[in-house]
A protein has these predicted regions:
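Short active-site neighborhood of thiol/selenol oxidoreductases, capturing the structured segment around
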Residues: 79-109
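Thiol/selenol-based redox catalytic cores and closely related redox-interacting motifs
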Residues: 150-216
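Generic structural signal for well-ordered beta-strand positions
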Residues: 77-78, 206
Length: 233
Protein backbone atom coordinates (compact mmCIF):
# COMPACT_ATOMS: atom_id res chain seq x y z
CA UNK A 1 0.00 0.00 0.00
CA UNK A 2 1.66 3.23 -1.21
CA UNK A 3 0.40 6.68 -0.35
CA UNK A 4 0.53 9.29 -3.09
CA UNK A 5 1.96 12.61 -2.00
CA UNK A 6 -0.13 15.74 -2.45
CA UNK A 7 2.15 16.85 -5.28
CA UNK A 8 1.68 13.50 -7.03
CA UNK A 9 -2.09 13.63 -6.65
CA UNK A 10 -2.50 17.29 -7.55
CA UNK A 11 -4.26 18.11 -10.83
CA UNK A 12 -3.08 21.71 -10.98
CA UNK A 13 -1.28 24.51 -9.16
CA UNK A 14 -3.87 24.73 -6.38
CA UNK A 15 -3.74 22.40 -3.41
CA UNK A 16 -6.53 19.85 -3.22
CA UNK A 17 -8.66 19.85 -0.06
CA UNK A 18 -7.30 17.57 2.64
CA UNK A 19 -10.69 15.89 2.93
CA UNK A 20 -10.26 14.59 -0.65
CA UNK A 21 -6.74 13.34 0.00
CA UNK A 22 -7.81 11.71 3.26
CA UNK A 23 -10.82 10.09 1.56
CA UNK A 24 -8.44 8.39 -0.88
CA UNK A 25 -6.24 7.17 1.96
CA UNK A 26 -9.25 5.87 3.85
CA UNK A 27 -10.28 3.93 0.73
CA UNK A 28 -6.84 2.30 0.60
CA UNK A 29 -7.08 1.43 4.29
CA UNK A 30 -10.54 -0.07 3.79
CA UNK A 31 -9.20 -2.13 0.87
CA UNK A 32 -5.94 -3.42 2.33
CA UNK A 33 -6.18 -3.30 6.14
CA UNK A 34 -8.02 -6.21 7.84
CA UNK A 35 -11.47 -5.33 9.13
CA UNK A 36 -10.59 -6.36 12.68
CA UNK A 37 -7.63 -3.97 12.66
CA UNK A 38 -9.81 -1.14 11.39
CA UNK A 39 -12.29 -1.90 14.17
CA UNK A 40 -9.57 -1.51 16.81
CA UNK A 41 -8.66 1.95 15.50
CA UNK A 42 -12.31 2.98 15.27
CA UNK A 43 -12.92 1.87 18.85
CA UNK A 44 -9.86 3.78 20.06
CA UNK A 45 -11.16 6.95 18.38
CA UNK A 46 -14.61 6.43 19.89
CA UNK A 47 -13.11 6.03 23.36
CA UNK A 48 -11.13 9.25 22.97
CA UNK A 49 -14.24 11.10 21.81
CA UNK A 50 -16.12 9.84 24.87
CA UNK A 51 -13.45 11.47 27.04
CA UNK A 52 -14.02 14.80 25.23
CA UNK A 53 -10.33 15.60 24.98
CA UNK A 54 -10.82 18.09 22.17
CA UNK A 55 -13.38 20.03 24.18
CA UNK A 56 -10.89 20.57 26.99
CA UNK A 57 -7.78 21.77 25.16
CA UNK A 58 -6.22 25.16 25.85
CA UNK A 59 -8.92 27.46 24.44
CA UNK A 60 -9.00 30.62 22.37
CA UNK A 61 -8.22 33.67 24.49
CA UNK A 62 -5.79 31.85 26.77
CA UNK A 63 -2.19 32.87 27.24
CA UNK A 64 -0.17 30.09 25.62
CA UNK A 65 2.63 28.46 27.60
CA UNK A 66 6.12 29.36 26.42
CA UNK A 67 8.15 26.50 24.96
CA UNK A 68 11.65 25.86 23.66
CA UNK A 69 12.11 22.69 21.58
CA UNK A 70 14.81 21.28 19.29
CA UNK A 71 14.05 21.20 15.59
CA UNK A 72 15.00 18.52 13.06
CA UNK A 73 18.56 19.91 12.98
CA UNK A 74 18.81 20.06 16.80
CA UNK A 75 18.52 23.87 16.74
CA UNK A 76 16.49 25.36 19.57
CA UNK A 77 13.21 27.02 18.60
CA UNK A 78 11.60 29.41 21.10
CA UNK A 79 7.93 30.31 20.86
CA UNK A 80 8.71 33.60 22.60
CA UNK A 81 11.23 34.58 19.94
CA UNK A 82 8.57 34.48 17.24
CA UNK A 83 6.27 36.68 19.34
CA UNK A 84 9.10 39.08 20.26
CA UNK A 85 9.88 39.43 16.56
CA UNK A 86 6.34 40.66 16.00
CA UNK A 87 5.15 37.57 14.15
CA UNK A 88 2.14 35.39 14.84
CA UNK A 89 2.94 31.74 15.48
CA UNK A 90 1.08 28.92 13.75
CA UNK A 91 1.84 25.38 14.89
CA UNK A 92 0.41 21.89 14.47
CA UNK A 93 0.74 19.00 16.89
CA UNK A 94 1.08 15.74 14.95
CA UNK A 95 1.58 12.10 15.90
CA UNK A 96 4.63 11.24 13.82
CA UNK A 97 6.16 10.29 10.49
CA UNK A 98 4.55 6.83 10.62
CA UNK A 99 1.02 8.33 10.38
CA UNK A 100 -0.16 8.82 6.76
CA UNK A 101 -2.65 11.47 7.86
CA UNK A 102 0.07 13.48 9.59
CA UNK A 103 2.24 13.18 6.49
CA UNK A 104 -0.63 14.39 4.30
CA UNK A 105 -1.21 17.37 6.54
CA UNK A 106 2.47 18.31 6.58
CA UNK A 107 2.70 18.04 2.78
CA UNK A 108 -0.31 20.35 2.52
CA UNK A 109 1.19 22.88 4.92
CA UNK A 110 4.43 22.72 2.96
CA UNK A 111 2.58 23.73 -0.21
CA UNK A 112 0.81 26.70 1.41
CA UNK A 113 3.87 27.85 3.39
CA UNK A 114 4.46 30.89 1.12
CA UNK A 115 0.86 32.00 1.74
CA UNK A 116 1.33 31.60 5.49
CA UNK A 117 4.53 33.61 5.49
CA UNK A 118 2.96 36.40 3.43
CA UNK A 119 0.47 36.96 6.26
CA UNK A 120 3.37 37.64 8.65
CA UNK A 121 3.15 34.32 10.49
CA UNK A 122 5.75 31.70 11.38
CA UNK A 123 4.84 28.02 11.01
CA UNK A 124 6.28 25.01 12.85
CA UNK A 125 5.08 21.46 13.50
CA UNK A 126 5.48 19.58 16.78
CA UNK A 127 5.58 15.81 17.37
CA UNK A 128 6.76 13.50 20.17
CA UNK A 129 9.23 11.75 17.88
CA UNK A 130 12.98 12.07 18.41
CA UNK A 131 15.11 14.64 16.63
CA UNK A 132 16.50 11.90 14.39
CA UNK A 133 13.00 10.80 13.35
CA UNK A 134 12.06 14.44 12.73
CA UNK A 135 15.15 14.81 10.55
CA UNK A 136 14.15 11.75 8.51
CA UNK A 137 10.60 13.07 8.07
CA UNK A 138 11.82 16.55 7.16
CA UNK A 139 14.25 15.16 4.60
CA UNK A 140 11.94 12.51 3.11
CA UNK A 141 9.06 14.92 2.50
CA UNK A 142 11.22 17.95 1.67
CA UNK A 143 9.58 20.07 4.34
CA UNK A 144 10.53 23.75 4.39
CA UNK A 145 9.53 24.56 7.96
CA UNK A 146 10.94 23.52 11.37
CA UNK A 147 9.81 20.14 12.69
CA UNK A 148 10.12 20.24 16.48
CA UNK A 149 10.61 17.29 18.84
CA UNK A 150 8.49 17.38 22.00
CA UNK A 151 10.16 14.66 24.08
CA UNK A 152 7.72 13.08 26.50
CA UNK A 153 4.88 15.23 25.11
CA UNK A 154 5.71 17.87 27.70
CA UNK A 155 4.45 20.76 25.59
CA UNK A 156 1.45 18.85 24.22
CA UNK A 157 0.43 18.07 27.80
CA UNK A 158 0.35 21.79 28.65
CA UNK A 159 -2.13 22.26 25.81
CA UNK A 160 -4.31 19.38 27.07
CA UNK A 161 -3.68 17.09 24.11
CA UNK A 162 -2.06 13.91 25.43
CA UNK A 163 -3.45 10.41 25.86
CA UNK A 164 -2.12 6.89 26.31
CA UNK A 165 -2.57 4.55 23.33
CA UNK A 166 -5.05 1.81 24.38
CA UNK A 167 -3.57 -1.66 24.86
CA UNK A 168 -5.42 -3.20 21.89
CA UNK A 169 -4.31 -0.41 19.59
CA UNK A 170 -0.76 -0.70 20.91
CA UNK A 171 -0.78 -4.39 19.94
CA UNK A 172 -1.96 -3.47 16.42
CA UNK A 173 0.77 -0.87 16.08
CA UNK A 174 3.41 -3.32 17.24
CA UNK A 175 2.28 -5.86 14.63
CA UNK A 176 2.51 -3.12 11.99
CA UNK A 177 6.05 -2.26 13.17
CA UNK A 178 4.97 1.12 14.55
CA UNK A 179 7.41 1.08 17.45
CA UNK A 180 6.59 4.19 19.45
CA UNK A 181 9.21 3.53 22.17
CA UNK A 182 11.85 3.62 19.42
CA UNK A 183 10.29 6.45 17.42
CA UNK A 184 9.61 8.66 20.43
CA UNK A 185 12.48 7.62 22.66
CA UNK A 186 10.34 6.64 25.66
CA UNK A 187 8.11 3.77 26.78
CA UNK A 188 5.01 5.81 27.61
CA UNK A 189 3.01 5.04 24.44
CA UNK A 190 1.61 8.54 24.74
CA UNK A 191 0.53 10.61 21.76
CA UNK A 192 -1.09 14.01 21.24
CA UNK A 193 -4.43 14.30 19.54
CA UNK A 194 -3.84 16.33 16.35
CA UNK A 195 -4.24 20.04 16.99
CA UNK A 196 -3.60 23.36 15.28
CA UNK A 197 -2.98 26.65 17.07
CA UNK A 198 -2.41 30.25 16.07
CA UNK A 199 -0.94 32.67 18.62
CA UNK A 200 -1.24 36.40 18.15
CA UNK A 201 1.64 38.81 18.58
CA UNK A 202 1.05 38.84 22.34
CA UNK A 203 1.25 35.06 22.67
CA UNK A 204 -2.52 34.69 23.17
CA UNK A 205 -4.43 31.87 21.48
CA UNK A 206 -6.19 33.33 18.43
CA UNK A 207 -7.27 30.00 16.89
CA UNK A 208 -7.47 26.47 18.28
CA UNK A 209 -8.62 23.29 16.55
CA UNK A 210 -8.26 19.70 17.77
CA UNK A 211 -9.88 16.38 16.99
CA UNK A 212 -9.75 13.01 18.70
CA UNK A 213 -10.11 11.47 15.24
CA UNK A 214 -6.62 11.54 13.74
CA UNK A 215 -8.12 11.24 10.24
CA UNK A 216 -9.67 14.71 10.53
CA UNK A 217 -7.62 17.95 10.32
CA UNK A 218 -8.49 21.58 9.54
CA UNK A 219 -8.22 22.54 5.89
CA UNK A 220 -5.07 24.53 5.06
CA UNK A 221 -7.25 27.08 3.23
CA UNK A 222 -9.19 27.65 6.47
CA UNK A 223 -5.97 28.36 8.35
CA UNK A 224 -4.76 30.84 5.74
CA UNK A 225 -8.18 32.50 5.81
CA UNK A 226 -7.94 33.00 9.60
CA UNK A 227 -4.48 34.54 9.22
CA UNK A 228 -5.64 36.87 6.45
CA UNK A 229 -8.87 37.89 8.18
CA UNK A 230 -7.04 39.00 11.33
CA UNK A 231 -3.79 40.51 10.04
CA UNK A 232 -3.30 42.87 12.97
CA UNK A 233 -3.75 40.30 15.74
Amino acid sequence: MKWRSLEESSTGPDIRPLREIYAERKELIAKYVPAETQAVHEQAIAELKSRKLAANILPVGSKAPHFVLPDHDSKAFSSSDAVLNGRRLLFCFIRGRWCPFCVGQMEAMNIILPQIERTGATFVAISPQTVKQSFFMHDQHKLRFPLLSDAGNKVARKFGLTYRVPARQEAVYRRAFVNLPFTNGDDSWELPIPATYILDRNGTVLYASANEDYTERPEPAEIVRVLRDDPGA
